[in-house]
Design a protein with these regions (language model features):
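Cytosolic nucleotide-binding catalytic cores of signal-transduction proteins
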Residues: 7
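Bacterial N-terminal signal peptides that target proteins for export
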Residues: 10-20
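Short, basic, low-complexity termini and linkers enriched in Ser/Thr/Gly/Pro
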Residues: 24-27
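Subset of outer-membrane beta-barrel
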Residues: 35-323
Length: 323
């Protein structure tokens, strides 16, 4: 009986990896990928934002905050704030629920996103496969009058986009054990068209839209010695119109309490990361990006803070602090 059971489980795992590989190959077929969504360095702790399948994955109710100031010293540079909540639900806790509020400010643009996530897990002996759905709404405000205008006769200087709403529908898949994880997601499958201007007399037409973003995340936890773990992680982001963005982080976890490491955003930034598990319920993480592009002549870098509060920490949970 054990041999039959083992054979069935192996067949299931092979099929799962075939599904994941097929989806990944599908993404690779996209070419000419532009960054339009906000970026953040501590993605391994805020996976729920771009992958709904992560909601409830840690088996505990959590409240998370992430704040980022990008390209310090540059007026109008991106500023991002995220508040997210997730919890397992159901008698067997094979489902997850998540809520998040996301705000991104870049110059005259202020975008806010409200979303709800639902996740469903299929458990195996030492791992689980989770599918997630995301639904929400985006609100965008744009005030061109905030720009430094050289041509005051431009009729569109005073054009204001106020609370332009767009629906959001996203999907994700997340496969993990206690030691490794792999996730693939598209947090919004709908193209967001924020405004269209047309002037027949001058044949002027302009449209601002947001393309579909794809995220691939993965990581592993190595036990170097009983008190030290090595946690490499990577995030690949692709969007039509720009080169693929690749983040790689190398973190260490000391005594299950202190996190430190470095990260690299390919051809963009080198980052230092540090974090502390203040208590069973509270974790604080910090990161500082040193820009490696031409922007470094005008900016002193980018700063990010992450705070996570867990509720019900007396329960036994899967991978409590590793990812």
């Amino acid at each position: 009986m054990w041999a039959i059971y083992s054979y069935i489980m192996i067949k299931k795992k092979i099929k799962i990896w075939q599904i994941i590989l097929s989806i990944l190959l599908g993404l690779i077929s996209f070419s000419n990928f532009a960054q339009q969504e906000a970026q953040f360095t501590q993605y391994m702790y805020a996976t729920q934002i771009f992958n709904p399948a992560y909601s409830g994955n840690r088996g505990i109710m959590s409240l998370k905050f992430l704040g980022r100031s990008q390209w310090l010293d540059i007026e109008g540079s991106p500023k991002t704030s995220i508040l997210a909540f997730d919890t397992p639900i159901g008698k067997s806790e094979n489902m997850g629920l998540g809520l998040s509020v996301f705000n991104d400010q870049i110059g005259p643009v202020n975008e806010t996103n409200f979303s709800i996530d639902y996740a469903y897990s299929i458990r195996f002996m030492f791992s689980k496969l989770t599918f997630g759905l995301k639904a929400g709404v985006n609100s965008m405000d744009i005030s061109f009058s905030k720009l430094n205008i050289y041509d005051n006769t431009d009729p569109y200087i005073n054009y204001v986009i106020d609370n332009k709403f767009q629906p959001q529908v996203g999907v994700g898949i997340f496969f993990n054990s206690e030691k490794y994880y792999l996730g693939l997601s598209a947090p919004n499958l709908l193209e967001k068209r924020f405004f269209e201007l047309a002037e027949s007399s001058s044949s002027f037409f302009s449209r601002v839209s947001d393309n579909i973003h794809f995220y691939l995340i993965g990581g592993y936890v190595f036990d170097l010695i009983p008190s030290l773990k090595f946690k490499p992680a990577t995030l690949v982001k692709a969007v039509r119109g720009s080169p693929i963005q690749w983040d790689l982080s190398l973190n260490f976890l000391l005594n299950n309490n202190f996190t430190f490491g470095i990260a690299n955003r390919l051809d963009s930034a080198i980052t230092g990361l540090a974090g502390i598990q203040v208590s069973d319920a509270l974790m604080i993480g910090l990161s500082y990006d040193f820009t490696t592009t031409e922007i470094e002549d005008y900016s002193s870098g980018s700063f990010e803070v992450f705070i996570r509060i867990d509720f019900g920490t007396n329960r036994k949970i899967l991978t409590p602090r590793f990812f």
